[in-house]
Amino acid sequence: MRIGIFDSGVGGITVLKEALNLLPGEDYIYYADTANVPYGTKDKNEVRQYIFKAVEFLINRGIEALVVACNTATSIAIKDLRETYQFPIVGMEPAVKPAVERSRNKKVLVLATPLTIREEKFRNLVSRVKAEDIVDSLGLPGLVEYAEGFVFDENIIIPYLKDRLSPFNLQEYGTLVLGCTHFLYFRDIFNKIIPDHIDIIDGNKGTVRHLKNLLLQSGFKTGSEGSGEIIFYSSGKKDERRLKKYLDILKEI
């Protein structure tokens, strides 16, 4: 079957990597809305228009299921997408519940885009696990821009992260949530600057497992018809070289 994966940019390639591991026999069309990245600092009505334009593009190329591999896009539009389209749709959300469960009676720090943090969906997510008193959040829009610009130099990234994290006493935290798919490119750098006792958690594997279960529940036979083809679009234009660059980076993480 043909699965669409959509993100504001290249962050969702980290989700594609997990999908290739768990659902290797499917065909994938990846859409990076690089003309409009980043979403996390824009007006949500503007972003909603970008999202539906991207999804229509993928529908016109025959997708049978969709992964919204962007926490910001999920928080803004996942409900509207599911009400509009009849095929299986899976979104991303910060992995707050597993982070709370693994925090060992310490606090949880959620890293995301400013728009994700501002949305009611995020507040509801924290409220559902009754964790308002132990969950803090921090927007890191610069990290999205670094990933999009293929900037992974520790001499640039580490000072940025240390500055942004400086208001927090990290000894108080047990888990760090990467609540934006772009942030996974920097997992190794996070590990170098946070205390050893802190676990880093993301929602990628859980999202792909949910996709597989949803496909089976919907009657799809996963791996039965696809050839493992991957097509990558940057705002409507094929860009296979860009895909390869980021997949190569992920092999090293």
Swiss-Prot record:
Pathway: Cell wall biogenesis; peptidoglycan biosynthesis. It catalyses: L-glutamate = D-glutamate. Keywords: Cell shape, Cell wall biogenesis/degradation, Isomerase, Peptidoglycan synthesis. Coiled coil: none annotated. Substrate binds at residues 7-8, 39-40, 71-72, 181-182. Its EC number is 5.1.1.3. SUPFAM superfamilies: Aspartate/glutamate racemase. GO terms for molecular function: glutamate racemase activity. It comes from the Bacteria. Disulfide bonds: none annotated. It is an enzyme of class 5 (isomerase). InterPro entries: Asp/Glu/hydantoin_racemase, Asp/Glu_race, Asp/Glu_racemase_AS_1, Glu_race. GO terms for biological process: cell wall organization; peptidoglycan biosynthetic process; regulation of cell shape. The active site is at residues 70, 180. PANTHER family: GLUTAMATE RACEMASE. NCBIfam families: glut_race. Belongs to the aspartate/glutamate racemases family. Provides the (R)-glutamate required for cell wall biosynthesis. This is Glutamate racemase. It comes from Halothermothrix orenii (strain H 168 / OCM 544 / DSM 9562). The gene is murI.
